[in-house]
Amino acid sequence: MRNIFIVLIFLFLSNCSEVKAQDKKYEGKQIIVQEPLQNNKTPQETNQESINSATKSVVHNNDNNQTEEVLIHDSREQKKPEIRPTKVTFKIDDNDMVLGNKKSNVIVVEYFSPTCPHCAYYHQTIFPELKKKYIDTNKIAYVIREFIATKQDLDAAILARCKGDINSFIQFHNIILQQQDKWAYSNKYRELLTDIGQLGGIPPEEYKQCLNSDKITATLIANTNLVAKAPKFIGTPSFFVNGVQTENYSIDNISKAVDKALDDETKKQINF
């Protein structure tokens, strides 16, 4: 009997040990599960952090892609379009300022702006040679037209056209370009232009009347709007030989275009 009692006690103690071991094992599992939450954040907050992290990664990748696209786009934009000959119809009208032979079949149209530094350079260095070769020899009709980009351009162009004749126009045209650095960028440009006009024989009151002339202003705006429609017009100075725009304003390029136009006219006359 005593032996049976001892066996029962042994079995009871063994059973308790197994329960305690299982409890300890279970408690270990609970600790493992709870470890990610030891930073006092709820499961929802932890999940939100994961979402935010993933979002930042996606945005970062998109930014890299967009940067690459911008670089590719910029590299395409840096490629300047090639200027190809573009035919534009230009006819000499009564308001044009023409040098040379008005009846010539070769018409060279120059577009300039009074405040354009490149235009001033052209007229002081390249134009004299062109004038000697083609204008003084009456081979071409050379038309000078204004492209108005600023208020200074408008006021200066009006001064040059104030008298209305070609000689007065050329006189003021040359002075305005030669003195460009003195008046074009001054806050008192109107006063300086008035002084230039007075020295050239245009009193202040007469210049004021010209500034208020709708006819002169309309002519200048019409000239500007016409060339602005040319597909390859890229600014001043620009030149059109029988309606075809030249590559640039070098003496070689302009002479090449003029010589070709003269040769074409000669061939037409022979065939006729």
Curated annotation (Swiss-Prot):
It is found in: Periplasm. Disulfide bonds join C116-C119. Residues 74-263 form the Thioredoxin domain. Residues 1-21 form the signal peptide. Keywords: Disulfide bond, Oxidoreductase, Periplasm, Redox-active center, Signal. Its EC number is 1.8.-.-. Transmembrane segments: none annotated. Its main location: periplasm. The keyword rRNA-binding does not apply. Gene3D superfamilies: Glutaredoxin. It is an enzyme of class 1 (oxidoreductase). GO terms for cellular component: periplasmic space. One of its GO terms (molecular function) is disulfide oxidoreductase activity. InterPro entries: Thioredoxin-like_fold, Thioredoxin-like_sf, Thioredoxin_CS, Thioredoxin_domain. Belongs to the thioredoxin family. DsbA subfamily. May be required for disulfide bond formation in some proteins. This is Putative protein-disulfide oxidoreductase RP025. It comes from Rickettsia prowazekii (strain Madrid E).
